[in-house]
Amino acid sequence: MNIISVGVNHKTAPIEIRERISLSEVQNKEFITGLVSSGLAHEAMVLSTCNRTELYVVPAMHEVTGEFLKEYLISYRDARKEVRPEHFFSRFYCSTARHLFEVASAIDSLVLGEGQILGQVKNAYRIAAEAQCAGIMITRLCHTAFSVAKKVKTKTRIMEGAVSVSYAAVELAQKIFSNLSLKKVLLVGAGETGELAAKHMFAKNARNIVITNRTISKAEALAEELGTNQVLPYESYKEHLHEFDIIITAVSTKDYALTEADMQPAMARRKLKPVIILDLGLPRNVDPNISKLQNMFLKDIDDLKHIIDKNLEKRRRELPKVHAIIEEELIAFGQWINTLKVRPTIVDLQSKFIEIKEKELERYRYKVSEEELQRMEHLTDRILKKILHHPIKMLKAPIDTTDSIPSRVNLVRNVFDLEEPNQSHF
């Protein structure tokens, strides 16, 4: 029995290669179904995201190796011109389990501790299960990975602290104003960065969000998605600056979108009530002289990146705790695999002794009363349980290496004269 993982990710291949080898959900299901239905694999699962495409396979044939699976995926994607086996990693046995545990717990991600990957692993398992390609091995592997991720999230701080510019901006605003639900927010720019910032604001209970954008339809679409339905024409939003406690800018512009001259009258009308401006533009959208105004807090990308760097360092300090959780679960998973390997021998051993018991009792069936026969049966059951206890315990005992499992199995089968088991996936 073996479980293999091969794949490309942000560590092994550039984005062009990752894009070329990635699979849609339809392709994912078709690919794993083909592996299993063709008799190449007992089980198969594919995890395909923007940063990785990874296969998890329980081979049904000795020929199905890591190299075979690399070539099989390259051929399926018709990507031989662009993709080479050197772009892939390979993992085997418990190394495969360790890798998936690290992926699910977000320590193998491009951004350490990012929260999306667990949902993506769960989706990969769902696809495999629906395609009837997830058997006992992949099911146990994935559910253990889910358990690892849950423990990592609850017992460590690996996912705490903002590590994206848009989220760092919102986190900073929350630190300054505490309750964002009481604040009015202006978003200048409805592009990708602005959209992320608005969604993070909404997630932190900000509900009074007004959006302005050069293309008004884009602002309206985002406002509708958030459910705020509040927009301002880009040409006139500066007339309303005094209304806002938080201003987020994320536009592409050669000149400053906000200047000191814009904010001076706004602050006067606010009677110097505090305002935070979060400049997410590159180049900067906001005149740095604005920060000289009283009760004005201006933070740009460099300020936010400093926050991100500090948060990433805090996350890195949590890595030893994460690895300890993974090691603990890996030991348990390895012991479970070992139990699977010895299970046929345990079943054969028990069956042989039960057969002997039944034959011997049959000899006395008509020589003793039914009540005496039942007592004899209970007695022999207790004797068998005690006789088999030690060999079964020895087979199940934890081991340091998988090499000793065959020797244990062979010893028991030889001592008790058990026939060779039928070949199976375990």
Swiss-Prot record:
Residues engaged in binding substrate: T49, C50, N51, R52, S109, E114, G115, Q116, Q120
Keywords: Chlorophyll biosynthesis, NADP, Oxidoreductase, Porphyrin biosynthesis
Enzyme class per UniProt: oxidoreductase
Site features described as Important for activity, chain residue numbers: H99
Pathway, per record: Porphyrin-containing compound metabolism; protoporphyrin-IX biosynthesis; 5-aminolevulinate from L-glutamyl-tRNA(Glu): step 1/2; Porphyrin-containing compound metabolism; chlorophyll biosynthesis
Single GO BP term: chlorophyll biosynthetic process
Gene Ontology molecular function: glutamyl-tRNA reductase activity; NADP binding
PROSITE patterns: GLUTR
Job description of the protein: Catalyzes the NADPH-dependent reduction of glutamyl-tRNA(Glu) to glutamate 1-semialdehyde (GSA).
Similarity comment: Belongs to the glutamyl-tRNA reductase family.
Full protein name: Glutamyl-tRNA reductase
Species this protein is from: Chlorobium chlorochromatii (strain CaD3)
